[in-house]
Amino acid sequence: MRHVPFLVLALGLASSQAQAATALFSLAIGYNGVPAEGSASGAGSLNFADDDALAVHELARTVARRSVVLALPDRATQARYPSSSETRPPSLVELRRALATLGADITRATAAGDEVTVWFFYSGHGWLDSDGRANLTLADGALSQDVLYNEVLPALPGRTVHLMIDACHAEALIRPRDVTAETVELSASEVASASLRSRLEHLPNVGVLMASASNTQAHEWDDYQTGVFTHELLSGLRGGADVNGDGRVEYSEIAAFLAAANREVTDPRARLTTLVVAPKLYPRVAIVDTRGARDVARLQGRAHHLGRFQIDDQRGNRLVDLRAEFGFPVDILVPAGEPILLSNESGETTIIAQADRPTNFEDVSLEKAHTRARSAMVDAMRRGLFAAEFGPSYYGGFVDSADKQMVPVDLSASGVRFAAEEQPRTAHRRAAWSAFAVAGASTVAAGIFAGLAARAYGDFQNTSLERPSIAARDRYESYGYAALGAAAVGVLSGALGYWLWHHRDDARSAN
């Protein structure tokens, strides 16, 4: 009986741990307007910042406990996003109101023992003031660097906060004030530098996902009807970046996914600068866990046969772009019970995926190709974006050469094998089929010649005349040798085909 209290305590602890959950809260802001002041005041209005915020909000509604969106959607956006009715103005006043609401929810969830994760997303104009400090444009003013770090982020007391910004000069938001504010392309080593990380020293629970582009056309794209970075980010968070198949998208995975998405864009006007920094305290925290997603269907399986493909919903919103490596199984979240369009450069098909059962990519067939006219820059984006294959092989190479502070996911525990180990042995298999065909034809020929030889041997046995006997013997020997030769070719071809079918390169076998 003396062990009963300990048993009760253990059961209580187990119960409390079982009840603990991961709670996501999301705040998405999108504003198309131009800044009232600053070096970017001459910039034109954006077209899709409101769409960006609503696209993030649409995904957040399926995985978050609460999602708030601040935007001024135009009529076209309202028609494409049913959740437009939930928007509030993207102003400092509404931002502070949303922070108060979400802060209270986060505090309650934390008190209940939940592990709280927060998304803070912004899309719009970024600009630099006369002192070189970064600002984000809102309808009633500016969200300054100081307000962001000293007021906004501290008001979101989650275990981890994921700061996602799609704006010009976004990278200046994490630079110390003594670092030049000139927008430059950031290499992996520069992203890893202490000068870029020092801004987050007092916020070690905050991770950063940012992008800026050399011009507005690269920042936004009519094909996507959203910002390019936002679309790439959401393609990854919907499951495209989940390289080890555990349902969680971590920072190293999304960084590799973004790198692959932009790798083949050769036109510098169309190239994004992306920056991904994981929270210092939790480098392997998940940005999203798709396993508990609600009101969604899943497209699953190996999709390499589709090449570079895209998924659009029934209202024309681009949900995902991806080009999967050979053998890489993907698991993509899509709306349940409504038509979605799956397409690539050669064709398309409409699918209605159900929440209670996944749809397998390998069961999908496309038809009806289509083409469109395009400009040089648009052509560069269409050829380059998502042209590189993504999967375990690309991910492994990326993390090996990237920021050493980036903590990679464990691929061995997931059962996911590197694509290099599963590369299609297409040439060997084609040669094997050819060898098998020769073996089959030779076997048939051997049988025919053997039959002819048997008939000639019968003629030889049944005749008593010298000349017919000699002729029958010659036929018998000729057909016999032909049968033996064909049989030998068949055996050798069959053996060669077997070897080719099971052949692996020495380097792959060693792996």
Language-model features: where?
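Boundary/activation segment at the start of structured domains
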Residues: 16-135, 382-412, 489
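Acidic, glycine-anchored loop motifs typical of Ca2+
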Residues: 44, 88, 245-251
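Cysteine protease catalytic core and zymogen-processing segment of caspase-like enzymes
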Residues: 47-53, 93, 106-109, 114, ...
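Bacterial N-terminal signal peptides
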Residues: 4-16
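Pro/Ala/Gly-rich low-complexity, hydrophilic intrinsically disordered segments
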Residues: 256-432
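Solvent-exposed, polar/charged alpha-helical surfaces in well-ordered, non-transmembrane soluble domains
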Residues: 51-58, 62, 93-100, 146, ...
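Short, flexible helix-coil boundary/hinge motifs
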Residues: 402-489, 496-511
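Acidic, divalent-cation-chelating loop motifs in proteins
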Residues: 240-244
